[in-house]
Amino acid sequence: MIIKRKFKTQIPSLERCKLGNESRKKKRKLNLGGGGYYYPLNLLGEIAAGIVPGNGRNGFSASWCTEVTKPVEVEESLSKRRSDSGTVRDSPPAEVSRPPLVRTSRGRIQVLPSRFNDSVLDNWRKDSKSDCDLEEEEIECRNEKVVSFRVPKATNLKSKELDRKSKYSALCKEERFHEQHNDEARARVDEKLPNKKGTFGPENFYSGDLVWAKSGRNEPFWPAIVIDPMTQAPELVLRSCIPDAACVVFFGHSGNENERDYAWVRRGMIFPFVDYVARFQEQPELQGCKPGNFQMALEEAFLADQGFTEKLMHDIHLAAGNSTFDDSFYRWIQETAVSNQELNNNAPRQGLLKKHRNPLACAGCETVISFEMAKKMKDLIPGDQLLCKPCSRLTKSKHICGICKKIRNHLDNKSWVRCDGCKVRIHAECDQISDRHLKDLRETDYYCPTCRAKFNFDLSDSEKQNSKSKVAKGDGQMVLPDKVIVVCAGVEGVYFPRLHLVVCKCGSCGPKKKALSEWERHTGSKSKNWKTSVKVKSSKLALEDWMMNLAELHANATAAKVPKRPSIKQRKQRLLAFLSETYEPVNAKWTTERCAVCRWVEDWDYNKIIICNRCQIAVHQECYGARHVRDFTSWVCKACERPDIKRECCLCPVKGGALKPTDVETLWVHVTCAWFQPEVCFASEEKMEPAVGILSIPSTNFVKICVICKQIHGSCTQCCKCSTYYHAMCASRAGYRMELHCLEKNGQQITKMVSYCAYHRAPNPDNVLIIQTPSGAFSAKSLVQNKKKGGSRLISLIREDDEAPAENTITCDPFSAARCRVFKRKINSKKRIEEEAIPHHTRGPRHHASAAIQTLNTFRHVPEEPKSFSSFRERLHHLQRTEMDRVCFGRSGIHGWGLFARRNIQEGEMVLEYRGEQVRGSIADLREARYRRVGKDCYLFKISEEVVVDATDKGNIARLINHSCTPNCYARIMSVGDEESRIVLIAKANVAVGEELTYDYLFDPDEAEELKVPCLCKAPNCRKFMN
């Protein structure tokens, strides 16, 4: 073997990439040590035999792993054929190849035989560097063939194109392989040198070169290989082509084992691989990457540098769509540069030669293309077929048969049809379409076999019909399939595209429809991504791909006529079918604390909060359309007029609430749900009934999953900022931000309802409906200072706090201990420092619950709570008779005496009435001044601007209730008829026995600083002052 170039390879040590196995680490240390050792050629396997990475002098840029020698079987066949045909006579026997000339570990040099005495060898002991970038090496292989290679100094794969403009070109004529290379290549050496010292550009590299490249400014340099974008890059990469940039493929895998990353790299972001290994293995940008990924990419690059590129080349051509790529063809073409005589005698390659007998002929019309024109051709279709300009334009416009892949040119006189789905043209005879049927296709839609295979599913009416070719005869509008058989983790199901739901066929789920993610968990799939795990049974296509193709088909399909709107009867049947699905009702506790529609606590003289006498819901008169109501004592809501019939909202699963009838019989809706459906409105603005437009709601709204109740029932509304869906009533009760925008456009008032999800606005249980007007926004907090608002507010409470002496104060006793004196109890003893709440019990300590002791009092009859009352006056009378069974007084943990629960009180239950003397507002002001002068506590509760309840002298036990910023009770003004109102305390939450009852006094917050009353509730959200 004659070698004119030092074949020295130095592999650096990778200190940052640590391996877990200690034995592997030692082994790698032995092989990859950076001590300047020579890499013996006999350890490279077949590289010494001729499998050298890079392109030879024949200039085939597409071949990265070119095999110079023919297989042994082919060689034996060739020698036998020569001997039989007499072409080669007296051929000498093949000599046994000697081991390559290497430098041993002791530094000795093997001496060549005498027949190589005329060869010139480099001195192994002199590591002198040449200034030329290209060095020749001639390798004599085992089969006595000599092939010249030009291997650049930077990388082993950096070779050579005949023309600078065609550095990504494909095949060339074999007659011109050698005549232009020697002269033109050396003439362009100066042009390929970097323009600036230390920087490289795309013009310095060719297809197959190993490089270091970076895809972005903050990205690390990564091992990559330069490819020919016209033949080896996917279509998506070609569309994002960047001028004056090289197309590279990074080593390593980005996703699974077949996905790789591509990039267009400009000048300054690309360097030779071997020369810059030591520089780029210690990059600071690699701190954010996994060392294992960089280690694997680096090892794959070293393997490619040694010629092992079969897997890499397969992945690149597979991604580029070159399904007909054959590596043996390029190897055989390169062998033709060695010996034209052996080309004619190579029998096993004759079939391949016949297939590519004229590389410069157009694959479409077989027109001969000149060599100069072939070098400029850039339009190649998958399979490396050379096309002329007319055929390339036809290929771009999809004038190519989707079955036989033949181009539709002027020489083709066959009948063609075009698919209405993918817009691909197909020969009629390729799809076996007769001439008679071809005439019928002019009036209907046609779909190619690929589209029919992708969307081959069963329909509910007939399992033999094909969904993609199912077309409405009346208007040509495509019809969605009713159902599709899908499979996930071996479990079958029926997918309904219109509902986006699945019915499981496992046998235990029944006919219940489930969401795709829920059904995926039910099947036991571990992927947690139904878009890829759920597949169509017939075509084995992922459901997401099936949906995308279906959407594309619908977008491409052109309807000849506007689709006819379904009749009212059909829409009603469809709506009732949606509502017949099983669901879990949401049982809500409706209290009188706030309006069930707008959730405001305040009311006004012209818009009072009225309470239903049966279901106990509280609504504003204007919110419910009850402006004409005057008798508030016996008023019942619309749903409670017929208590024997249960009314439920058809737009949400929440039971109860402020319901209104619709124009569809037996269907009711919440006022809130109707407000937040753009298609629904009320026929009468004054009465707010009936709700019309229920049948106009899109069907897609009935199949959305509410993010709050996690159910599919009714119609969901959407967040104005994102695609989050929820029921309007669920969002209202969860404290979502909901707004009513009032606008005026062209002299007409426009109302728009807007809601926000939990991500865009933080939910708050005290949120109310915010009214946005051109003059500003109105909420409950902004209207606290409205003096016309009627409210249950304690307007005055004066309590003089005795100043407690300091604990460490020592008082001197002037008397002796023997003298008898009157015992004085200390008010603030050490035992009462913590101010614990102690209810007052007259029976001493007890070891049993109050309810258990109450059952022993058989002599005392405790009346049961009636289920219903005919009027509020009757309810109030019952409340007065039983108030001592519910509450008692005791020492408060907040201030002085307090009010305590004698038994468990449920949320929304009326506790007791706040009784006292009702006086005019002017009289209340005079009494308050008098109470202040004498230092007496005063308890004044305002019902309205004209009426105030004074419980200072003539009140009941309710006046002992203390203030808290987190109360468990609230006050509500009840009308008992004849323009008479009462104040009732109602439980805001469940109150346990012995727990202190508190209420928010709601003092006016605009008091002066000197009139501020400190708060002593010690609540986490304490406001520090009551006003």
Swiss-Prot record:
It is found in: Nucleus. A zinc finger (PHD-type) spans 704-761. Residues 75-84 have a biased composition (Basic and acidic residues). S-adenosyl-L-methionine binds at H895, Y939, N962, H963. Keywords: Chromatin regulator, Metal-binding, Methyltransferase, Nucleus, Repeat, S-adenosyl-L-methionine, Transferase, Zinc, Zinc-finger. Residues 75-104 are annotated as: Disordered. Residues 1011-1027 form the Post-SET domain. A zinc finger (C2HC pre-PHD-type) spans 646-680. It is an enzyme of class 2 (transferase). InterPro entries: ATX3/4/5_ePHD, ATX3/4/5_PHD, EPHD, Hist-Lys_N-MeTrfase_ATX, Histone_Mod_Regulator, Post-SET_dom, PWWP_dom, SET_dom. GO terms for molecular function: histone methyltransferase activity; zinc ion binding. PROSITE patterns: EPHD, POST_SET, PWWP, SAM_MT43_TRX_MLL, SET, ZF_PHD_1, ZF_PHD_2. One of its GO terms (cellular component) is Ino80 complex. Zn(2+) binds at C965, C1015, C1017, C1022. This is Histone-lysine N-methyltransferase ATX4. Belongs to the class V-like SAM-binding methyltransferase superfamily. Histone-lysine methyltransferase family. TRX/MLL subfamily. It comes from Arabidopsis thaliana (Mouse-ear cress). GO terms for biological process: methylation. Residues 885-1002 form the SET domain. Its EC number is 2.1.1.-. Residues 207-276 form the PWWP domain. It catalyses: L-lysyl-[histone] + S-adenosyl-L-methionine = N(6)-methyl-L-lysyl-[histone] + S-adenosyl-L-homocysteine + H(+). Histone methyltransferase.
